[in-house]
Design a protein with these regions (language model features):
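S-adenosyl-L-methionine-dependent methyltransferase catalytic core, i.e., the SAM/SAH-binding region
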Residues: 1-194
Length: 194
């Protein structure tokens, strides 16, 4: 009996199912309902049905409950992080490279989007989040710019708007440093908000 903590596209699960050769069962969790449904369908079409695979739409932190339910696991795989499927989809709001809603949630039916979070967060808390979650060296300047924009009545609700604020905030940098610094800063800010 195996457990894949983050089903994603299902590549690891498929490889493990092939190794089991029909003599075992895989359990997999993922919090993304959209990708889980696609992966389930794709694996079923490849011959890996419910008799071999159980997919649970939940966080892998429930592994203890699942293990008790099934009597434990012989092996566990956890490939943690956001998948390229999520990053490449502009509707998910994970990438600063393309315009999309500033969402950043793995499961868009749960919790609040990054844009909604920015609507309610104060300058100090945002600066702390940027520093703590991504070691952002310009955390104070960025927090001020973002919260000032919101205070003026302009929502930061798209990936492009957030990127533009970052670019404007770092406009003081020498031209030869600016492009790379803006890119790295965007990466850190999006990471911190996730």
């Amino acid at each position: 009996i195996g457990f894949d903590a983050t089903l994603g596209y299902g590549g690891h699960t498929k490889a493990m199912l092939q190794c089991l050769q029909g003599k075992g069962h895989m359990y997999a969790t993922d919090v993304d309902p959209e990708e889980s449904a696609k992966t389930k369908k794709r694996l079923e079409e490849q011959g890996f049905g419910e008799d071999m695979l159980t997919i649970k739409l939940q966080n892998f932190c429930t592994i203890d409950e699942i293990a008790k339910e099934v009597g434990g696991f012989d092996f566990i795989l956890a490939d943690l992080g956001v998948s390229s499927m999520q990053i490449d989809n502009p509707k998910r709001g994970f990438s600063f490279k393309v315009d999309g809603p500033l969402d950043l949630r793995l499961n868009q039916q749960k919790g609040i989007s990054a844009a909604e979070r920015l609507d309610t967060i104060g300058r100090e808390e945002l600066a702390g989040m940027l520093y703590e979650n991504s070691d952002e060296p310009y955390c104070e300047e960025l927090a001020k710019a973002i919260t000032d924009e919101i205070r003026r009545g302009h929502r930061v609700d798209t990936t492009t708007k957030l990127r533009e604020i970052i670019e404007k905030t770092l406009d003081f940098l020498p031209e030869k440093e600016k492009k790379e610094t803006v890119k790295k800063t965007c990466q850190r800010v999006f990471q911190a908000l996730r």
